[in-house]
Amino acid sequence: MDFALNLTQEQRLAMTQEMQLSIKLLQMSSFELQEYVEKELQENPVLDIKESNVDKVEKDKLEYKEIIKNLDFDNYSHHSYDRNPDEEVSPFNFISEEKSLKEYLKDQIRDLDENQCIKTICLYIIENIDDRGYLILENEEIEEELKISKELAAYCVDLIHSLEPHGIGARNLAECLKIQIKQKDMDEENIFIMIDKYLEFIAENKYNVIAKELNIDVKQAQEYGDLIKTLSPKPSRGFYTGESVRYISPDAYIKKIDSEYFIIMNDDLTPRLTINAIYKDIINNDTDKDAVSYVKEKLNSALFLIKSIQHRKSTIYRVLEKIVEIQKDYFDYGESYLKPMTLKEIASSMDMHESTVSRAIRDKYIHINRGIVKIKDLFTTGMAASFSEENVSSLIIKNSIKKMIDNEDRKKPLSDQKICDLINEEGMNISRRTVAKYREEMGIKSSKGRKRF
């Protein structure tokens, strides 16, 4: 009886652990899952990666390259290299694709017609530029650390400021913007005053206040503001700074073949896991009880993981299958055909819990004929429409708001209330607060912020 009770408890515990892992993996993004699997591969010796044919070919290539490296090319040159002897090797072949900001700056310093002492000081300053392109040292610190004069430190910092990208080596946003203005050969004092004192007013479109303070025309103040807005607040933008860029990879591809849609799961996102055969032999043949117990524990953990990854894939697939069924018009014709669709609706139709659907779409993406789409964006709340039995998608309303704003008179932009009235005239029932909410979600300023003088 005790044995049966213990067995039942162990089975329940195992089931609980498996369910917890399943839930945990389901809500992970593909990137988070990759990191988790890599960690498990390091910690669990029973886990192994199933080698694909592509991996084997790449492995063979690497082994072949190693063999070639050890060959005596003096003896084999007439057989192994058939490049035209007159063909020039481009120096660009040896340039790294990811040239860092600091490397780019150092190259410019080396090309300057300055003595080696000044170049060395400039190289030191470059090493103290952060990932944004800002200098983290004051002139006094440079003087003190390098034991140089005030004039020499200032001269070298000015040299850094003359480099590209413009604005490099500034200590703060205002200095960064002013360096860029100087590079444009502009010396209008009011622009510098606006940068020093009125950046917040520029952001809030309060050009009437700025114009009054500077005793200039409102239109002129706005033109200066427009110029300032074209400047980069982050000089390092576009350069490799040592941080890896994470690109979005879709969890699945939605492909239309003839008149039917197919869901192709992206299996490249996670390694194909298997059980290392060596550890299977230990369980079957080893007499060391501790070793067998350890391997069994790790084996159960590995099997839980493999099963949970398969369950994650299956759940996402099933949810996508239902989405494609409901949103066929969206996939065929575009955003304006997106139907209102809720988590509850999907869950109910699949006999699945709403929280499971929520986890299945969290931070997941699909690739469709118009690009990569976040699955969550396909779930919209509905607004009542007097002209249709179906609700109108919030995305359709957002498109209407954006279209109205794009076509408005810039000198007399539409208020949220006016947009609300116009949308209601089209037969869609919506409040002013909802208009404001959707406008802000699209990153569009209020009528006050959009006004042109």
UniProtKB/Swiss-Prot annotation:
Protein species of origin: Clostridium kluyveri (strain ATCC 8527 / DSM 555 / NBRC 12016 / NCIMB 10680 / K1)
Family: Belongs to the sigma-54 factor family.
Gene3D superfamilies named among the record's database cross-references: Homeodomain-like, RNA polymerase sigma-54 factor, core-binding domain
One GO-annotated biological process of the protein: DNA-templated transcription initiation
CC annotations in GO: DNA-directed RNA polymerase complex
Pfam families with a match to the protein in the record: Sigma54_AID, Sigma54_CBD, Sigma54_DBD
Protein name (record): Putative RNA polymerase sigma-54 factor
Residue range(s) of DNA binding per entry: 342-361
Gene Ontology MF: a single term: nucleotidyltransferase activity
Domain of life: Bacteria
InterPro entries: RNA_pol_sigma_54, RNA_pol_sigma_54_core-bd, RNA_pol_sigma_54_DNA-bd, RpoN_core-bd_sf
Function: Sigma factors are initiation factors that promote the attachment of RNA polymerase to specific initiation sites and are then released.
Record flagged with keyword Nucleotidyltransferase: yes
Keywords: DNA-binding, DNA-directed RNA polymerase, Nucleotidyltransferase, Sigma factor, Transcription, Transcription regulation, Transferase
Motif window: RPON box: 431-439
Transmembrane segments annotated in the record for this chain: none
